[in-house]
A protein has these predicted regions:
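Amphipathic alpha-helical effector-binding/dimerization core
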Residues: 29-128
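Sensor-regulatory modules in signal-transduction proteins
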Residues: 174-177
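N-terminal helix-turn-helix
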Residues: 1-47, 51-52, 212, 216-217
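Residue-level recognition of specific faces of alpha-helices
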Residues: 16-22, 36, 70, 81, ...
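Juxtadomain coupling helices with adjacent low-complexity linkers
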Residues: 182-219
Length: 219
């Protein structure tokens, strides 16, 4: 009804999608999505100009640090992963292109939120449910606001085991030609591999260098 497409045509489309493994209907009438449909979204995300152009830079950064690197954008109250280069190290948190995480609780999300207009940020903070994922998690809006202010001033966000114990991540912004933050770049490490101070001393300069390269691609 919403698309104006005849019922017969819709049935034919659904039949084709069913044969391709994207949908199914146990009763032959009520169709549901299969997990395979996610591949279509992943393919689209991976083919966006930023994701496509960024992949060589991400791979180089990941190989140099031997750590996983990602790029994400803000999508509603979440961050959406649009590009990723994984290291050989096994990470406890399973992330891929298309993965979503709550923006307020992640390093990339805080970088992105720290550059949002005040009104938009206020609306988001009014909606968010702050879950205490670990004993390290920021647990109040007031503390989060203070952290976002610090992130904006220093130009990077360090998430020290707030989303998951044993996981540290460091993120920096990616600016477009208008000087607006379009995405964020991060590196995630096992806490046992590197201290927070070591991340800032060793990883941050390389992360900022990669961000400058990627920012040029956005201009």
């Amino acid at each position: 009804q919403k698309t104006g497409i005849p019922r017969a045509a819709v049935r034919r489309c659904l039949y084709t999608l069913s044969k391709l493994g994207f949908v199914y209907a146990e009763d032959g009438k009520n169709f549901q999505l299969r997990p395979r449909i996610l591949a279509l979204g992943h393919a689209w995300l991976a083919s966006t100009p930023l994701a496509r152009s960024a992949q060589p830079v991400l791979r180089h950064l990941s190989e140099m640090l031997n750590e996983s690197c990602s790029i994400a954008t803000l999508d509603g109250d979440d961050i959406l992963y649009i590009a990723r280069a994984s290291s050989s190290r096994i990470m406890t948190i399973d992330l891929d292109i298309g993965s979503r995480l709550p923006a307020w609780a992640t390093s990339m999300g805080r970088v992105l939120l720290s550059h949002q207009p005040e009104e938009k940020l206020n609306d988001m903070l009014a909606r968010v449910t702050m879950i205490r994922y670990t004993p390290q998690t920021v647990d109040s809006v007031a503390k989060l606001r203070a952290e976002l202010k610090r992130v904006h001033q220093q130009g990077y966000a360090l998430n020290d085991q707030e989303l998951e114990m044993g996981l540290r991540s460091l993120a920096v912004p990616l600016f477009n030609a208008q000087g607006q933050v379009q995405a964020a770049l991060n590196v995630g490490v096992h806490a046992g591999q590197m201290t927070a101070r070591e991340m800032i001393e060793r990883v941050l300069p390389e992360l900022q260098k990669a961000a400058r390269e990627l920012t040029l691609l956005l201009r």
